């Protein structure tokens, strides 16, 4: 099986897995499948190996650990090293526009600034000194956020839209999610930084993908490879087709082809997640609220949820105040005075 077919299967498998996770993430089916697979594996693997894996997974996903942050920087460094070493040099020889070739470095500079801000900024840690103030920022919807609920770990009243992060072991104001890639929670005070970081990361991956593909296409055009012929396995001359051309380019520029494949997949994944993050920002939701929304409504209204004759109920998002105000709140966190203006 040639390289093109294998690479196509790899891309298709990866994208299908991501789509399946996105589709079933709000249901119990995926969890049941994962737990069932884990139980099957547990029966055939030694106890010592299971304990080692559990310890490793706990360290990586249930404690603040810089492993994913280091992996993020390593992958980003490798991508830019390959871009600088080969793609940039070859594109200069083919007389590409210099501003276009420098654009990935501009995006990298901006990305690193907002990456640092996302990592280092307090996401909105709730403490005894600020809990009374934060309790006044958002109204309680009495569905996902009951008025008198307390955090059993921090022993503090829980402001609306807050959540206790088990990884960081703290309650976070307007909690969105814990991001292992920045080793920090995403909350009220760093969501804006996170969005710009995600936007520039997506743009840099897409720009490198476009420039790498443009280099290969111009190389094919300059070399007139489509007009060449080759000998097949039966000794007959065949016109160069797309499959043969890709394999030829892979043999001639293997690192660039791998780079192109990686950044294409990365661009698609990041673009999908960026669209989701922008949707949440435009509707003034957090990832935590989006994930919990349907389940919280079903718990609060069991008769409505399970009665076949009842009309379907929709959980109203009381925190959305229009597109412009919602986006403004992402970059300028809401305050008690902000809430009063909206009344």
From Swiss-Prot:
Subcellular location(s) of the protein:
Endoplasmic reticulum membrane; Golgi apparatus membrane; Cell membrane
> Which UniProt keywords are given for this protein, alphabetically ordered?
Acyltransferase, Cell membrane, Endoplasmic reticulum, Golgi apparatus, Lipoprotein, Membrane, Palmitate, Transferase, Transmembrane, Transmembrane helix
Q: Where is the signal peptide?
A: none
Residue positions of motif Di-lysine motif? 340-343
Domain DHHC as annotated: residue spans: 149-199
Q: Which GO terms describe its biological process?
A: positive regulation of innate immune response; protein localization to plasma membrane; protein targeting to membrane
InterPro entries linked: Palmitoyltrfase_DHHC, PFA4/ZDH16/20/ERF2-like
Oligomeric state and interaction partners are given as: Interacts with CPT1A.
Notes on the domains: The C-terminal di-lysine motif confers endoplasmic reticulum localization. The DHHC domain is required for palmitoyltransferase activity.
Protein's recorded name? Palmitoyltransferase ZDHHC4
């Amino acid at each position: 099986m040639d390289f093109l077919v294998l690479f196509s299967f790899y891309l298709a498998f990866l994208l299908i897995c991501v789509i399946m996770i996105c589709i079933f993430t709000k249901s119990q089916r995926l969890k049941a499948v994962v737990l069932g697979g884990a139980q099957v594996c547990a029966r055939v693997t030694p106890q010592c190996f299971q304990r080692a894996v559990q310890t490793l997974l706990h360290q990586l996903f249930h404690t603040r650990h810089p492993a994913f942050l280091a992996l993020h920087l390593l992958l980003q460094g490798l991508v830019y090293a390959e871009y600088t070493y080969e793609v940039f040099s070859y594109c200069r020889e083919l007389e590409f526009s210099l501003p276009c070739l420098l654009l990935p470095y501009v995006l990298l500079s901006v990305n690193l600034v907002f990456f640092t801000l996302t990592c280092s900024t307090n996401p909105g840690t709730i403490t005894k000194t600020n809990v009374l103030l934060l309790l006044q920022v958002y109204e309680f919807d009495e569905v996902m956020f009951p008025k008198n609920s307390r955090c059993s770990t921090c022993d503090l009243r829980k402001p609306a839209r807050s959540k206790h992060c088990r990884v960081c072991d703290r309650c976070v104001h307007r909690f969105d999610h814990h991001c292992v890639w920045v080793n920090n929670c995403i909350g009220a005070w760093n969501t804006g930084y996170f969005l710009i970081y995600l936007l520039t990361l997506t743009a840099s991956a897409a720009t490198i993908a476009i420039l790498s593909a443009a280099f290969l296409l111009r190389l094919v055009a300059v070399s007139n490879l489509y007009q060449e012929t080759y000998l097949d396995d039966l000794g007959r001359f065949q016109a160069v087709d797309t499959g043969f051309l890709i394999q030829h380019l892979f043999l001639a520029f293997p690192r660039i082809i791998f780079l192109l494949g990686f950044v294409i997949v990365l661009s698609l994944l990041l673009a999908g997640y960026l669209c989701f993050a922008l949707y949440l920002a435009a509707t003034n939701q957090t990832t935590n609220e989006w994930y919990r929304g349907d389940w919280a409504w079903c718990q609060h209204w069991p008769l409505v949820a399970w009665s076949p004759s009842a009309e379907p109920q929709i959980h109203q998002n009381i925190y959305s105040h229009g597109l412009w105000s919602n986006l403004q709140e992402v970059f300028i966190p809401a305050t008690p005075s902000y809430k009063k203006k909206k009344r």
